[in-house]
Amino acid sequence: MARLTAEPVGVRGLAIRAVLFKGTRDLLPIYALYGVLFADHGLGTAQISLLLALWSVTAFVLEVPSGAWADTVSRRVLLILSCVLQAVCFVLWMVAPSFLGFALGFVVWGVASSLESGTFEALIYDDLVARGETLSYARIMGWTRGAQESTVLLAILVAAPLFALGGYALVGWVSVGVAVLHTLTAFALPSAPVAISATAVDDLDDEPAMPGPHAVPGAAPIHAADTESARGLARYLTMLRTGTTEALGVRRVRRGVLLGALLYGLTSFDEYFGLLAVSGGASTSVSALLVGVTVAGSLLGSLLAGRAEAVPARGLAAALFAAGVLFIAGALAVGAMSPVFLWAGFVGIGVAYGIDFTVEVVAGARLQDAIEGPARATVTSFSGLLSEIVALAVFGVVAVATQWLSVSSTIALFGIVLLVAALLIPSWLPPRK
């Protein structure tokens, strides 16, 4: 992140606030252990997959509607609300550690995820548009993803000693405290894009007419609240329609949406890394360290995203294809039930995970460049929506496949999807702006 100081002062300040927001979002020790937490409270693999699917379904249903909302109202307010709901999720897990409590928590978390998805990216990109600094977007997104992965790694490393000191209760309540801190960082984000939006222009055009001699005597007065509500609904529906048209009707945008959704949604296999480690013979504490190896890979991948933004599509495709091969080999190595193969397997998975992160960040930046309409958050939310479908497919495959295959063999299947994604990149990745 040393190059952050080379950015213009205004962009640097924006980058710092964005990094603080995203960094605190995942500084959660519970991340390393919640799969094991569910298992230790009597839930099987299928039930855990059901919980994860419930999380994704909630975010799926609300994804695009919340994106249009973010194109209509204050994006910062929505991000603050998202942070509060995330904290509520972990409180529910601590006070009601049962299938129902975990399920309710995931529903709340799903709402929080839908409010953030697309909203944060649109807020940052539109702010950069107003500054004439859109080329900084990929770097800032790489730094924010790097901050996320750094804090995830820190949280994972802290999870083991926290668990040893106070069990799941200490891990959970520390996570609640971090979620509250995350809420505070949301207040520091820009309150709105600097550039006037299409919505604001509509507001100017739609100012109510002043009373005049042509007013109808005795006509029922139009209440300001009713008028504002109607205008707000009209703006919302306009943004929803505009974003939907661009996401589905513009070829380069549609392909960018699909590619980003595939690359990001596929990473939901990381929810099973803890269980994969345990299935390979690792203890609970060691499993947290092994998950940390994969996070280290994603951290490096995120930090390299800014440099990789200029790499040709075929180069990115070749890198992702190599990642698919490494992922398959790594997952199968974990299943060998040997300490050496266990660690070697997770190193391979970590490298593959990092490459996937690099390519996914670049794909996200290219998508933002391709969007030309005012409903940026709505279009971005379509990618988030489809990524939830991919995530649901991942959870479904794991739930079904583990009935016949080992965990390691099941996880290895997703390396094949990485190979397919690599073949799609040359034709689906939007061109540089």
PLM-predicted stretches and their roles:
Residues 127, 175-204, 427-433:
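Helix-loop junctions on the cytosolic side of multi-pass membrane transporters
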